[in-house]
Curated annotation (Swiss-Prot):
GO terms for biological process: activation of NF-kappaB-inducing kinase activity; innate immune response; lipopolysaccharide-mediated signaling pathway; protein K63-linked ubiquitination; regulation of apoptotic process; regulation of canonical NF-kappaB signal transduction. Its main location: cytoplasm. Highly expressed in ovary and moderately expressed in kidney, spleen, stomach, colon and testis. A zinc finger (RING-type) spans 72-111. It comes from Xenopus laevis. This is TNF receptor-associated factor 6-A. GO terms for cellular component: cell cortex; cytoplasm; cytoplasmic side of plasma membrane; glutamatergic synapse; lipid droplet; nucleus. One of its GO terms (molecular function) is tumor necrosis factor receptor binding. Transmembrane segments: none annotated. The keyword Transferase applies. The gene is traf6-a.
Amino acid sequence: MSILNPRTSLEAGDSEDACCAAMASVCCINTKEDADSPSAGLPSGTTQNLDVEEIQGYDVEFDPPLESKYECPICLMALREAVQTPCGHRFCKACILKSLRNAGHKCPVDNEILMEKQLFPDNFAKREILSLRVKCPNLGCTDTMELRHLEHHLVQCQFASVECSQCQGSFLKLLLDKHMEHECGRRRTFCDNCGLAMAYEDKSGHELICPMAYVTCDYCQTNLIREQMPAHYSMDCTMAPIPCMYCEFGCREKMQRHNLAGHLQDFTQAHMRMMAQTLRSFSTTPTSHISDISFCDPNQFEPVPLSVAPAHPSHMPSQQDCSQETRNLRETVEQLEGRLVRQDHQIRELIAKMETQCTYVNELKHTIHSLEDKVADMDAHRCNGVFIWRIKGFSGLQKSQEEEKPVVIHSPGFYTGDPGYKLCLRLHLQLPSAQRCANYISLFVHTMQGDYDSLLPWPLQGTIRLSILDQSESTARQDQVEVMDTKPDLLAFQRPTAPRNPKGFGYVTFMHLNTLKQRQYVKNDTLLVRCSVNIHLDLTSPRREGFQPRSGEGTL
């Protein structure tokens, strides 16, 4: 009876026969069922050597809650590696072994004499416990599974805390990849200038010293890589302050490099006097102080500062030595004066060439501007009444509008045909403080003086279609469109008497700025405005007057 119903025999625990029957039933259980235990595959000797005293019951949340018959009386948790005593009580293997070794050989429940060799594994209870469903202990995870599958789930659970291998921080597994690729301060990155690999948090510091990074000259605002900047300061920068080349003779002037030539030209006589004064000081200087000066190469001449004091008469060299030194100094001065004259001529020639080049550059700029105007005029003639206005840098215009700065821009002129009327568009971003039209895009059409005004009938009559284009990739684009007919009695459509008619015609509330966010009206920071004009050449045809219907897309 106890073999067929082992649960009853285990729960009773009142008679020695019942305990023996439970032991017999457990021993008959298939070894495949024992494999549910983490230590089932280990040899018996290995299992005995494990530090089982440190392993208590399963501290997990069961769903439904754990029945009391599966609780260990010692650790009050679910039985782990359940064993049964001859007196019919169940314990975790580690718990009862620790109790027997620390508290003596007795059962903790009824104080019956109990030896370690009397314990036997309760595989039936073990299998029952491993079949119970438990909740994942990781915060945020709602999965439940059998206890035997919990360890495998914890390995794969996306809500488990794992350590970042780069910064050693703790993160949820599902967020680890994003952290390591985009957020980790120690993630690997490369300098945009020199290509050096480094941690992301070190990049900003590296940019301050990167030899290949572009920096701006403090004087001329030229952009150069950092390693070129010292040579630029000392050799090329026309705005860098430099001392006069005669500073060693006593000139204390400092000027920008491009002003050096003018300074040398204006102070030639002063420089000569400084040189003469310096040379006179040599005549009263001991030979030992000037013996190091080589008079063979004037390019290497290094004058002694003016602060050198005259020597005591007792140390004066002989008259013959002074005469020879004076002759050498005079030769040096003559050579330097010759060099100065040649350099003065070279400077004058360079100034003349520079003026010629400046004139030539100005002529080229004028030619370029003329060509640009011609190209723009050709484009205006070629549009044939359909004009697309590309407004670049639209985010900057919106920022100015948000700062209560007026934003009014005009498009280039365009023709309705060849010959045709010349028109332009005006876009106005209404300020947030504007009454009745705050934060709206206003769009108007203006007539302009064109090449064919004398050949065309006035006032202008036709239909004008204004659109702000949806730049999304989908086929179901939703352009913001308004259509209006011209009104001949308005000044906006009369022949203009100024380059651009100050009177325009259009919509004050063409489109709300918030509508731009609903579709991709702005792409690559560019807004596209399309104007299509259909001219009515038959002056006797009836014209549509009165209220002009508006598209429903422009309303909020």
